[in-house]
Regions:
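Conserved SAM-binding loop of SAM-dependent methyltransferases across substrates and taxa
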Residues: 47-63
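Short beta-strand element of Class I
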Residues: 66-69
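Glycine-rich helix-loop-beta junction characteristic of Rossmann-like nucleotide cofactor-binding loops
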Residues: 21-34, 60
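Class I S-adenosyl-L-methionine
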Residues: 1-22, 39, 71-261
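Conserved class I S-adenosyl-L-methionine
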Residues: 36-46
Length: 261
């Protein structure tokens, strides 16, 4: 059956990612300490192999009561995934057709996953996750075009004049800025190397875990309340210095600053 073969195969493929790279023990610890239903959002779920594997791992193997929602722009894929979830009685697993930027289906989430959400779609996913105070954020960004169009830095002109190098540096700087913004908004953030089973090139994984004393960054300082109390308010945020050096202003920055809705 599909349940025994496809899901099992997907779980085996993603086993290392699920248990080690993505650090699911973090969310298991959260659930153990708080018996409420775990709500997980998978933005840009695609064919949803990972979404099914997550549900299988956390619900079937770990016995957690879950509410997992996958969102994607491809309507036919969403219809198919909902049929499979219904067929195999995965009552806590559902799929929606829609754009990440327009999603208003919840005002809270324990965990937000976004793999290969193109360009600024990742920014909207990260912003929503931070706004919901999600305990865990897992993001593998791709197609970082926004910074590539803006970046200008005189000391780097010798490198940026080469299109391919400019493209790759822009992608790295995009994710560095995202990691800084996550840190400044209450998350312990790691930047890890990641290879998934459907995309052979190596990618960057942003793994962010919300700190216990976290608060959304102060609008002016870009620092959490805890950081302000510790005296770090005199230090200009890394994200601001990086953005100013590269002469960039990204969608995630604008969202956090209230310039976009």
């Amino acid at each position: 059956s599909w349940k025994e073969q496809e899901v099992s195969e997907a779980f085996n493929q993603y086993n290392d990612m699920l248990e080690n790279i993505l650090g699911y023990e973090v969310i298991l610890d959260m659930v153990r300490n708080d018996k409420t239903i775990t709500k997980i959002l998978d933005f840009g779920c695609g064919k949803s192999y990972l979404t099914f594997a997550m549900y299988y791992y956390l619900h079937e193997l770990k016995g957690l009561t879950l509410e997992v929602t996958g969102l994607d722009l491809k309507k036919d894929v969403i219809v198919h995934c909902n049929e499979l979830a219904k067929k195999y009685h995965y009552e806590g697993l559902s799929f929606l057709h829609g754009d990440i930027a327009d999603y208003t289906g919840t005002d809270s989430a324990d965990m937000v996953v976004t793999l290969h959400a193109c360009d600024t779609a990742t920014d909207y996913a990260l912003y929503k996750a931070m706004k919901w105070h999600a305990g865990v954020i897992l993001s593998v960004p791709c197609c970082q075009h926004e910074v590539n169009k803006q970046i200008a830095c005189e000391p780097l002109e010798g490198a940026l004049k080469y299109g391919l190098i400019k493209e790759r540096l822009s992608a790295l700087f995009t994710d560095a800025l995202r990691a800084d913004l996550l840190e400044e908004n209450g998350y312990d953030t790691q930047v890890l190397e990641f290879i998934d089973m459907e995309h052979t090139p190596k990618n960057i994984l942003l793994r962010a875990v919300r700190r216990v004393d976290a608060g959304m960054a102060d609008e002016q300082s870009g620092l959490t309340e805890a950081e302000q109390k510790s005296g770090q308010c005199c230090k200009e945020p890394d994200s601001k210095r990086l953005a100013e050096t590269l002469q960039i202003h990204t969608t995630l920055q604008k969202l956090l600053e209230g310039e976009l809705v």
